[in-house]
Amino acid sequence: GESGSGKTTIRSHLLSAFLSFSSTPLSSKLSYAAFLFDTLTTTKSLTTQTASKAGLFLELQYDGSSSVNPTLIGGKIIDHRLERSRITSVPTGERSFHVLYYLLAGTSPAEKAHLGFDKAVHVSTSSGAIGHKRWRYLGHPTQLKVGVNDVEGFQHFKTALRKLEFPRSEIAEICQILATILHIGQLEFASGQATTTHAEESGGYSHEGGETVTIVKNKDVLSIIAAFLGLSVEDLENSFGYRTKTIHRERVTVMLDPKGARQNADELARTIYSLLVAYVIEAVNQRICAAEDSVANTISIVDFPGFAQACATGSTLDQLFNNAATELLYNFCLQSFFDRKADELEREEVSVPATSYFDNTDAVRGLLKHGNGLLSILDDQTRRGRTDNQLLESLRRRFENKNPTIIVEGSKRTSLISQNARSAFTVKHFAGEIDYSVNGLIEENGEFISGDLMRLMKSTKSDFVRELFGQAALQTVTHPKEKTAIMQAQVSSKPLRMPSMARRKTSPSSRLAFDAGDADEVESQAESIAKDSSSGRRKSAMLTSGIQGAAGQFLSSLDIVNKCLSSTNLNPYFIFCLKPNDRRIANQFDSKCVRAQVQMFGIAEISQRLRNADFSVFLPFAEFLGLAEIGNIVVVGSDKEKAEVVLDEKRWPGNEARVGSTGVFLSERCWADLAKVGERVVPVYAADMSDEGGDGLLHPRSTGYGDSKVRLLNPADQSPGAFIYGDEAKQGYFGSRDLDGRSDAGNSAFNSGDMFRNHETREQMLEKGNEKKMEEVDDAPISGSRKRWIALVYLLTFYIPDFAIKLFGRIKRKDVRMAWREKFAINLIIWFSCGVAIFFIVAFPGLVCPTQHVYSAAELSSHNGKDGHSSFIAIRGVVFDLDKFMPGHYPHIVPESALKKYAGVDATGLFPVQVSALCQGKSGSVDPTVLLDYRPTNISGSATTISGTDTNSVYHDFRHFTNDSRPDWFYEQMVMLKANYLKGYVGYTPKYLNTLGKKSQSIGSINGKVYDLTSYIAGGRLTKAPPGETVPSDVDTDFMDNSVVSLFQSLPGQDLSKHWENLKIDALRRRMQLCLDNLFFVGHVDTRNSAQCEFARYFILAISVLICSIIVFKFLAALQFGRKNVPENLDKFIICQVPAYTEDEESLRRAIDSMARMRYDDKRKLLVVICDGMIIGQGNDRPTPRIVLDILGVPESVDPEPLSFESLGEGQKQHNMGKVYSGLYEVQGHIVPFLVIVKVGKPSEVSRPGNRGKRDSQMVLMKIPERVHYNLPMSPMELEMHHQIRNVIGVNPTFYEFILQVDADTVVAPDSATRMVAAFLNDTRLIGVCGETALTNAKTSAVTMIQVYEYYISHNLTKAFESLFGSVTCLPGCFTMYRIRSAETAKPLFVSKEVVDAYAEIRVDTLHMKNLLHLGEDRYLTTLLLKHHSKYKTKYISSAKAWTIAPESWTVFLSQRRRWINSTVHNLIELIPMQQLCGFCCFSMRFVVFVDLLSTVIQPVTLAYIIYLIYWLVKDTSTIPYTSLILLAAIYGLQALIFIIRRKWEMVGWMIVYLLALPVFSLPCPSTLSGTWTTLPGVTHVSSQERKAGKVVISDEGKFDPASIPKKKWEEYQTELWEAQTSRDDRSEVSGISYGTKSYHPAQSEYGFPGSRPMSQLDLPRFGSRMSLAPSEMMSRHADMEMENLSHLPSDDAILAEIREILRTADLMSVTKKSIKLELERAFGVNLDLKRPYINSGKGYTFPFPVLRTVC
């Protein structure tokens, strides 16, 4: 029937009817099993709420103990092809599989919290779905409420699992996996920048952290998924961002964009659900299936999804499979009614009228025929790795004009555009024509699960997930050479079990059905997969593995079904389901709709056939007569005549009963009548179902079990559960007794409470998943410096206990806690350094010379309110702010101009004082009539004092004798003025006090305060009474003690503090002090020019000047004037290395072309490109190695075998494999030899195969010269590189003296190599040279703009200064040339054993080593060169230019600077202890290195100081810090002079941009450094107290055995080469490459693969190696020659000596083999044709480049 016609419903009724005959615990289990199948595989579609989306072959198994009343002994569910696409693509208006909705709706709040359903996700804003959560995999939120009782469904689901004996823990795991699938749909992906550096990062831009990666935005959802799958969050997130595929026979990792990551996540969801369904069904079958030998008969229900007119989920493959299965079943139906019956009738000589019918055999044959049917072709094309268009072409060739039911559109000559538009084929099904698109069909048919996912799941900590991915339903493809390496996998589209009848051959006692031949065929088809032998060249993984695609598996499963149905002893029954209307309206009959279905299924023709011949059963005469029981009737004649008598007696119609030649044909009705089926007593069995633990035995009962008969007819007992259809009151598989038969507490808690109560929490699972695998390794000694550092770390962090880090930081591992302590200690050191810097800048001067708020007379007079100056005024030694005071002066009638005339002067005379109010005198009181005539000292020598005769003084005179006496007025005013307007005090320097003392002034200082008693001693003590009163006669005007007065008289102008303390006036001291402070105080001692203050001032100044002097020195070093003469042509051999990672083609082409176009002798350049892994970067359409090879012109047909070499990595990752290509690259007239090394990794590597990082790429090239110079054994790939350089390119590797390292995003100037080599030749003590690097993307963004000036000045100032000492501390890896060996002694330098071993360190077990090796390998390489070759120099030359790409985004820029600062700090720490750094005085490099280190750490303080200076200048224009400004001007002015002198006028603008961005460089970078100082997630070797061995390694790569990589010396290699070639005459060592010719014999390697063919018209030397498989045209012919008398010819040794002499004096640019032969013939005077093979072989010598052509 069609979809929505009720097939699933009727199937459930049918099953219930069968099970009602044996109501046993087993029948209940079978009912539960069918319900589980429906729950997992049915969905709500547009036409029905129970649309089946998987084919079902449901088998009920019976024993043969009773031929009349067989016993039900088991059952089997065989599922066919679940519609997996529905999981991730829910059609509009439909639902996904019911179980997902059950889980969401039926879980309790506690369970929802555990499953992560309690968090709001994607809340829809549409009016129709307010409040619903939007789940991507559940369709529109309205589908959550469509009349299906999901809550009850979930309870039934759990009950069914428990009744089928699933453990509770397993049920919980199943629910977790289902929740995981829903959460995978919620993941949101975005593009981000990789800001965390790993050891595997490589290349230029990408190495700087600029690699675009895909990240998960909602990390909370990701953590839920990781917890339930038992995986690490980081590993899971990374796995979504890439996918490993097999492209052109190569494993390639594709870096995915967010869209690709979404597809990757969808694949994961489909895979998990498919495996879960397979797992549950197989587990159910294990519980219900009987032993195959005990099964005698079966009743099978076959139900496949209905015919699909449209592709609802977008999966053409699912639609094709569904319709193919429906086509097959319909064809079987027609065959059963027409063809098979006709054959039997004809054989029995029974004639019936013929009936015409629609025959769909052509469609079935076209779709399902083995070998050349459509599904077979699809599978074959998938296995061959063909494209969709190639599939279409194959279908066209197969079916065009050959099968009318399959039409392939278009033709061969169709244009590409129209071909893509028409890429579809049409199948004429019995139900109508359907167009199937081929776009993506090949890939969909593969249904491959990437090896990345399998590798990820291999690391799961969840036993259940491990079991899911370990079941037989998951077919894996392993590498042919490494069986443990899973390349890819596939969820089987074929059932795990076969029908019982397919397993059994025909037996006499059973009607279970195959004959021997069919049974053997089906058995072999089901249990074995043909293995394709892989001979010759390597094929795709699918072709070599023999794994079938989905089409092949589905076809074989349909074939088994068809053979089972077509078996001879099977009786088929057909049920046609017709839907009454297309609109799902109850009680409405649409005749048009029904008529269309009747016509489609040919029901009228079938009915007509049955009217003519309704013969379902054929009985031989003996069996028929036995059933007819004619023993009492005497009939004389043959059996046939007796049968005719019986038929006449029964009076059955002729279309239901006919006599044949050997038996009788009967209809079902006639057979039932004959066998008296209705009269038999069918015993009904029952068992105690109150407890699952019952005996399970069957007990005959006199009456039927409960409702065993009612279930067949009662509409209240619908199946499979009326809740699926939306009627909660109805019961289906479950009666009220079955929903939950047990009432114990545990069960009810499980059913309605929290099934995860005794389960691990999500947090525990997440922590378990994040744990690293640990295994023991050998103990490694800890260095003394490391021990001292650890001691310092604990000293700084001892107050933080380990348990606190473990508890609050959630850090369980001891090594990570130690790393955290180190980070925290480093933070403390950084901030302590900043604090020390702040202390010296701010606090230190204040401590040595406390700040004084004093003003000298000159300073006071300068504050006169004129020319923008402020207005200050002094009163009795106290300085006030007149500007602030004037607006509030009372009375307001006094104009401000009148007040301003007092600005800058001492106005003490304006304020007469009442002595008695301010001084208690000697006796405790002073007579109020006593006056003090105070005249302030004129300390400036100018008119800065106001006399007491000033007219305004009367306004402040409130003394006793006035008519307005206010004794305390002055004191109150001073208190108010000091509180609001105080600026400081009048200052007297000790020197000036001494001067005044010499001028007979009675002035002195006590404890820093200056007192002037001159007027008191000179007679200024007066008396005056108020008007009308007289002055008492006994007034004592001497209110000061004589000892005090005499002290000032005897020691004028001095510090009287000690003398004051020694006075014997203890009783009077307080009163005298009060009088001095109130009446005679004139200011403070000014110590600003004292020795301590001068020290404080000049100490900071000296440091500033010292640092600035370094700047000056750097400036002088940068002024390297002189003519930039272009050197003469140089004859040194150089290697130009370019590491490639994920760069785009444009960047790679620019870099490679710029190297090739350098104005340096092409024959002496070797371009080496090292591709770090088989990776397709985002935005690229090919792997990076393929891009490089395409640029260099290497065709895809050149495919060398990968060879082993030792790499930098953890564990087994140290074993890497690589391919070697060589040839000539021609660009713009330059022809340059090249070598390409492609790191492809071992077969077991499925993720980023071969990728080991930039440092490893450098090591690949560094090890070759090292092995050569030290004559060390080489790995196979190194031997091949040596062979390619020496024998193919034609240059002895020892000739190369320099290596130029350039990043893949860097473009070099044409003369850069020439200038660098010239520098090396001018100074033989030079080991490394770098040039000036500028930016190509300077104006791309604001981030790049702020870097332009910094790049320029860092080269032309810092590096130029370091170059003066020959100690450039950082030779950038993007543009540096190194000296490979010493010019005089050939001693290895760059490739010396010490440097190579130190640089190849793989134990990165500390933060320090991680910062050295992973964050700044270029700088560390320079550090190693300076450490191990201290007598050699590193240099910077500005004449060599290159241009690179700077980070364009803020995130990448900060990431880059964080790594740079980390690397700088740690490398400077390495350099500081070195004694060998050159220099002189305080300008030694050690000092400069220390200053650089310190300046890097305290950059935030520097920025803060500059901001403070600016604030100071803005706030107080009167006080200008000239020194600071001069120093700053010197720093930046000298920098400006550099580019001004060099006429780099554009740098003026870039300098302004840089200065504006100074906060960016000074604050965020160091603060980011300290806040997120490099973490240690990749710690590999750490101490652990938990392991007695002392060390553990955290690695899942296994241990590396160096013996797994065979090594041999070059001499051994050559010896074996010679022996191999002399022992066999069919192989010549002269099997070279003739490039540019049509006949070409590749140079072979020892390892048996053809060499590469560069694209050039030149011929490379024909050197082969031992195991060359392709014969050369120069095959040795010694064995075929006639043995002549060769005594007159010179010996080989003589020829060799003469050749060497010729080469020593010949022009190597023009010499050829032919010219050498002619020279030899002249020298020896004989014809040397017989010696030609020896001359051409090159034994004992090597022809130099250019290659000598074999033309003799």
UniProtKB/Swiss-Prot annotation:
Pfam family, one: Myosin_head
Binding site for ATP: 1-8
SUPFAM superfamilies given in the database record: Cytochrome b5-like heme/steroid binding domain, DEK C-terminal domain, Nucleotide-diphospho-sugar transferases, P-loop containing nucleoside triphosphate hydrolases
Knockout-associated phenotype: Leads to reduced levels of mycelial chitin, periodic swellings along the length of hyphae, and a block in conidiation. Does not affect virulence in a mouse model of pulmonary aspergillosis.
SMART domains: Cyt-b5, MYSc
Induction: Expressed during hyphal growth.
Transmembrane segments: 789-809, 828-848, 1099-1119, 1494-1514, 1520-1540, 1547-1567
CDD domains, alphabetized: MYSc_Myo17
Keyword annotations from UniProtKB, A to Z: Actin-binding, ATP-binding, Cell membrane, Glycoprotein, Glycosyltransferase, Membrane, Motor protein, Myosin, Nucleotide-binding, Transferase, Transmembrane, Transmembrane helix
Catalytic activity: [(1->4)-N-acetyl-beta-D-glucosaminyl](n) + UDP-N-acetyl-alpha-D-glucosamine = [(1->4)-N-acetyl-beta-D-glucosaminyl](n+1) + UDP + H(+)
Annotated InterPro entries: Chitin_synth, Cyt_B5-like_heme/steroid-bd, Cyt_B5-like_heme/steroid_sf, DEK_C, Kinesin_motor_dom_sf, Myosin_head_motor_dom-like, MYSc_Myo17, Nucleotide-diphossugar_trans
Origin superkingdom: Eukaryota
Keyword field contains Flavoprotein: no
Record bears the keyword Transmembrane: yes
Compartments where located: Cell membrane; Cell septum; Cell tip
GO biological process: chitin biosynthetic process; fungal-type cell wall organization
Membrane topology, as annotated: Multi-pass membrane protein
Positions annotated as glycosylated: 938, 963, 1322, 1356, 1462, 1685
Stated family: In the N-terminal section; belongs to the TRAFAC class myosin-kinesin ATPase superfamily. Myosin family.
This protein's name: Chitin synthase E
